Amino acid sequence: MNAQEIIRSIEAEQMKTQLPVLHIGDTVKVNVRIREGGKERIQAFEGTIISMARAGINRTVTVRRIFQGIGVERVFLVHSPRIESMTVTRLGKVRRAKLYYLRDRIGKATRVKQKITRKAN
């Protein structure tokens, strides 16, 4: 085994298997473990995915939300042990790979169209 194969095998052990299918424009709820002092609690962060980067264990997702009139963005490592769970609450319909233009929008203009899925008969 060479060094790359060893690294791949270690990374494969650390990767999460139970992940939802994520797409740009989806609204997701991310539950993150936060340590405050000696206590550990779970903090929820819900927002729209504006970008996804990298692959494998280094995959990141940038989530944006508006909190008290101010835009807040957080970058999450998808396979991090700090992430308790990730759930898709709403499917978005967009035609871009990066939604950085949402940073310049205010109010209702920041909404993303909802993807409507129909069941086949």
Swiss-Prot record:
The keyword Ribosomal protein applies. GO terms for molecular function: structural constituent of ribosome. One of its GO terms (biological process) is translation. GO terms for cellular component: cytosolic large ribosomal subunit. Keywords: Ribonucleoprotein, Ribosomal protein. Gene3D superfamilies: 2.30.30.790. InterPro entries: Ribosomal_bL19 (IPR001857), Ribosomal_bL19_CS (IPR018257), Ribosomal_bL19_sf (IPR038657), Translation_prot_SH3-like_sf (IPR008991). Signal peptide: none annotated. PROSITE patterns: RIBOSOMAL_L19. This protein is located at the 30S-50S ribosomal subunit interface and may play a role in the structure and function of the aminoacyl-tRNA binding site. NCBIfam families: rplS_bact. PANTHER family: LARGE RIBOSOMAL SUBUNIT PROTEIN BL19M, RIBOSOMAL PROTEIN L19. Belongs to the bacterial ribosomal protein bL19 family. This is Large ribosomal subunit protein bL19. It comes from Gloeobacter violaceus (strain ATCC 29082 / PCC 7421).
